[in-house]
């Protein structure tokens, strides 16, 4: 029987991955992490199909433990990935288990290729960024690009509902507030700052207009190469509550001015505040991907793909690609080998099929 180990399987994202994988009774699913009690609690919730194991991602015997458990696929959900090294991925290669993570940290995802030779040597796939970015975002661009002879710009983003994400996710996305980041603009790299350059983006109902600002994601580095000769790649994100977005923007200026070193140490307090305000906010989230360029007759063309999520189902979306890829690996349906960012491994339909039953809808418009 094939076996999937979900590292961090009792966290916000990990639990969702476990729940989805455990629905297939033909494979073993192991909830893993440092806290065995929490792992057992999640495994017990599954009603029998999941097991629990104590695993420390920093342990020197991690590879041996994965081998002992019989892992075929490891899904690493224990973020934040900003500042992490590849110790888990290396252990998976040594244990001869495929590796999938939900990282959206730019340096982490873009650097995963350093493990390519080792992964190929052991006939494995090591895929980083099986999340909203770059897995879903690149799948959308791949789907839309068939209408274009040339893509000149890619502008995409995400706006979340009032339900706050987990602590690790907040630490990751607020860690670069006010910090410089490189953005591809008009065929040259320019410096912008995290959570600044606020833009008002109008989304279809039920979302409406939202403020979004600069975020540092792998797409900013990967897309200029993958979709060359694209001249501009921009990614922005935001939250539903205007006061929260403007507060983040204001705090980013304190970091940029050197009055604060980072917002990371303030995240617990910020999250507690967000939890108190949650009931006053929207339950709707959205993602958009806008391509502009030329069609086959060299005429200007623009297309926008929208993903609209209601009833607090938006936080499920970052897990969909990892679940889809893990399921395909467990079924032996993925031929790709090597270490790479998660692009070109899944289609939009394959990713969204995992979200069947959620309050999600998509549409494409010509702007």
Give the positions of each predicted feature.
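Active-site-lining helix/loop region of Rossmann-like oxidoreductase modules
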Residues: 7, 146-292, 299
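Residues in the short beta-alpha loop(s) of Rossmann-like NAD(P)-binding domains
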Residues: 10, 33-36
């Amino acid at each position: 029987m094939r076996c999937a180990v979900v590292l961090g399987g009792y966290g916000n994202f990990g639990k969702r991955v476990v729940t989805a994988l455990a629905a297939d009774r033909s494979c073993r699913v192991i909830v893993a992490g440092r806290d065995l009690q929490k792992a057992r609690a999640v495994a017990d919730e599954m009603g029998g199909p999941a097991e629990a194991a104590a695993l420390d991602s920093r342990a020197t015997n991690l590879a041996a433990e994965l081998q002992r458990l019989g892992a075929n696929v490891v899904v690493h959900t224990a973020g934040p990935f900003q500042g992490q090294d590849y110790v888990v991925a290396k252990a998976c290669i040594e244990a001869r288990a495929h590796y999938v993570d939900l990282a959206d940290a730019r340096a982490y995802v873009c650097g995963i290729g350093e493990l390519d030779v080792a992964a190929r040597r052991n006939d494995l796939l090591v895929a980083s960024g099986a999340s909203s970015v770059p897995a879903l975002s690149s799948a959308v661009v791949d789907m839309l690009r068939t209408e274009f002879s040339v893509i000149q710009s890619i502008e995409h983003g995400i706006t979340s509902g009032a339900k706050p994400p987990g602590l690790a996710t907040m630490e990751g996305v607020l860690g670069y507030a006010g910090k410089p980041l490189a953005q591809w603009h008009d065929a040259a790299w320019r410096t912008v700052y995290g959570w600044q350059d606020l833009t008002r983006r109008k989304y279809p109902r039920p979302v409406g207009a939202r403020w979004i600002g600069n975020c540092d994601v792998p797409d900013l580095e990967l897309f200029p190469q993958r979709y060359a000769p694209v001249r501009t790649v921009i990614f922005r994100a935001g939250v539903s509550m205007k006061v929260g977005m403007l507060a983040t923007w204001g705090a980013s200026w304190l970091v940029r001015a050197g009055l604060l070193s980072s917002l990371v140490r303030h995240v617990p307090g910020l999250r507690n505040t967000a939890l108190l305000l949650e009931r006053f906010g929207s339950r709707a989230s959205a993602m958009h991907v806008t391509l502009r360029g030329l069609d086959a007759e060299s005429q200007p063309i623009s297309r926008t793909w929208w993903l609209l999520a209601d009833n607090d189902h938006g936080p499920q979306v970052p897990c969909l690609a990892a679940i889809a890829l893990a399921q395909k690996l467990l079924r032996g349906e993925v031929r790709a080998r090597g270490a790479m960012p998660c692009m070109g491994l899944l289609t939009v339909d394959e990713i969204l099929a995992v979200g069947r039953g959620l309050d999600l809808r998509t549409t494409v418009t010509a702007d």
